[in-house]
């Protein structure tokens, strides 16, 4: 499968080269009086992009979508069996692949074309509106969604926005709460190493110093990342949470929500999973968040941050104390 996935990057290369060459040419011809937002160090796309450049960007991102999802070449779907959680392959269903209703055997993301459309739309909104901050995904599998986000930001010359790729890179943790979902930890197909994910970024020419891999179960890694973001005064313009479990969603929201500025977005991949939905509902209620929820692809949702709130981190610290954790895995 690794060889097949490596070859997929070639599909995107010609379009990428054309887009880059045209962009370089246009910058050389661009007059000095074009509006540039100096504080963001990026061109305002609505003012600076030519129609040809927009068309090339559109082709590049569409090509990425059908490649990263395995849609273009009808990649078979992984079907999870029962008992020993065996892996079975079945023919691709076009509708399921579009909305992220299956797991591609050859591909880089399971969120479907609609899920990637959502990332593109929200990133374009924050770019257009001048909302500062990075893209962060917590729970990345093979890295495809984060790769696509990086590609979108690159295509708009967003050179100052980081991409944070957060995962254990060894699958989901066993649940420590009796009402949480524990079977995820038994699914070996969810365990993809950091080296493999990093390699995927490299194959698509998306790996640079602005991409950061944060490894570890969220309860151990995200409190440390929280400290790092505070020290660096980083913001998160788009936060994508894909934790599947009650505990994981609480880890993500309590450690990272405070960094999303007004106008930024929270994407919840697992709105269709009851325990994950419960965590999000409790977090929103606890912090009196009334922002409108926008469902999409049947199982996910997002909302836009409308006001800054102090996160009740002391509650989270007490919650962590109730969990059976491995002190040796503590990172900070």
Label each region the model flagged:
Residues 3, 43-46, 330:
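Intrinsically disordered, low-complexity regions enriched in polar/acidic and amide residues
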Residues 118-129:
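Conserved alpha-helix/loop element of class I SAM-dependent methyltransferases that forms part
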Residues 39, 45, 312-314:
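Compositionally biased, intrinsically disordered low-complexity segments
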Residues 84-89:
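Long intrinsically disordered, low-complexity regions that are acidic and Ser/Thr-rich
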Residues 41-77:
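N-terminal auxiliary segments of SAM/dcSAM-dependent transferases
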Residues 1-39:
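N-terminal signal-anchor transmembrane helix specifying type II single-pass membrane topology
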């Amino acid at each position: 499968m690794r060889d097949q996935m490596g070859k997929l990057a070639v599909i995107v290369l010609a379009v990428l080269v054309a887009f880059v060459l045209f962009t370089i040419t246009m910058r050389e011809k661009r007059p000095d009086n074009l509006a540039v937002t100096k504080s963001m160090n990026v061109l305002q796309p609505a003012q600076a992009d030519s129609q040809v450049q927009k068309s090339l960007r559109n082709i590049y991102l569409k090509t990425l979508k059908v490649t990263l999802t395995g849609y273009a070449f009808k990649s078979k779907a992984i079907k999870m069996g029962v008992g020993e959680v065996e892996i079975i392959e079945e023919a691709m269903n076009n509708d399921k692949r579009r909305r992220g209703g299956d797991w591609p055997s050859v591909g880089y993301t399971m969120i479907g074309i609609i899920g990637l459309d959502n990332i593109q739309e929200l990133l374009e909104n924050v770019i257009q509106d001048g909302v500062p901050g990075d893209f962060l995904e917590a729970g990345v599998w093979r890295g495809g969604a984060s790769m696509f986000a990086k590609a979108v930001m690159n295509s708009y010359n967003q050179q100052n926005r980081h991409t944070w790729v957060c995962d254990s890179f060894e699958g989901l943790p066993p649940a420590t709460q009796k009402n949480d979902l524990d079977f995820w930890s038994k699914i070996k197909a969810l365990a993809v190493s950091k080296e493999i994910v990093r390699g995927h970024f490299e194959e698509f020419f998306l790996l640079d110093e602005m991409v950061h891999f944060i490894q570890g179960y969220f309860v151990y890694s995200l409190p440390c990342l929280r400290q790092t973001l505070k020290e660096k005064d980083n913001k998160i313009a788009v936060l994508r949470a894909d934790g599947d479990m009650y505990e994981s969603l609480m880890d993500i929201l309590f450690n990272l929500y405070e960094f999303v500025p007004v106008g930024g977005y929270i994407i919840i991949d697992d709105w269709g999973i009851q325990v994950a939905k419960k965590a999000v509902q409790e977090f929103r209620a606890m912090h009196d968040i009334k922002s409108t929820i926008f469902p999409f692809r049947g199982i996910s949702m997002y909302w836009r941050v409308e006001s800054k709130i102090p996160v009740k981190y002391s509650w989270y610290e007490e919650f962590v104390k109730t969990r059976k954790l491995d002190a040796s895995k503590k990172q900070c």
